[in-house]
């Protein structure tokens, strides 16, 4: 855990990126399956 001053830790970047990707995919699939044609 050295050299983290002034930088964002890699685990934090990975966690935030993973959450964002999963969230976007979840919203996309939710809109596709729940709305089908109404969301387009």
Curated annotation (Swiss-Prot):
Subcellular location, record wording: Plastid, Chloroplast thylakoid membrane
GO-annotated cellular components: chloroplast thylakoid membrane; photosystem II reaction center
Keyword Magnesium listed: no
Membrane-traversing stretches: 8-28
Primary location group: plastid
GO BP term, pick one: photosynthesis
Keywords: Chloroplast, Membrane, Photosynthesis, Photosystem II, Plastid, Reaction center, Thylakoid, Transmembrane, Transmembrane helix
Entries under InterPro entries matching the protein: PSII_PsbJ, PSII_PsbJ_sf
Topology in the lipid bilayer: Single-pass membrane protein
Highest taxon listed in the record's lineage: Eukaryota
Assembly information from the UniProt record: PSII is composed of 1 copy each of membrane proteins PsbA, PsbB, PsbC, PsbD, PsbE, PsbF, PsbH, PsbI, PsbJ, PsbK, PsbL, PsbM, PsbT, PsbX, PsbY, PsbZ, Psb30/Ycf12, at least 3 peripheral proteins of the oxygen-evolving complex and a large number of cofactors. It forms dimeric complexes.
Function comment: One of the components of the core complex of photosystem II (PSII). PSII is a light-driven water:plastoquinone oxidoreductase that uses light energy to abstract electrons from H(2)O, generating O(2) and a proton gradient subsequently used for ATP formation. It consists of a core antenna complex that captures photons, and an electron transfer chain that converts photonic excitation into a charge separation.
Membership in a protein family: Belongs to the PsbJ family.
HAMAP family: PSII_PsbJ
Name of the protein in question: Photosystem II reaction center protein J
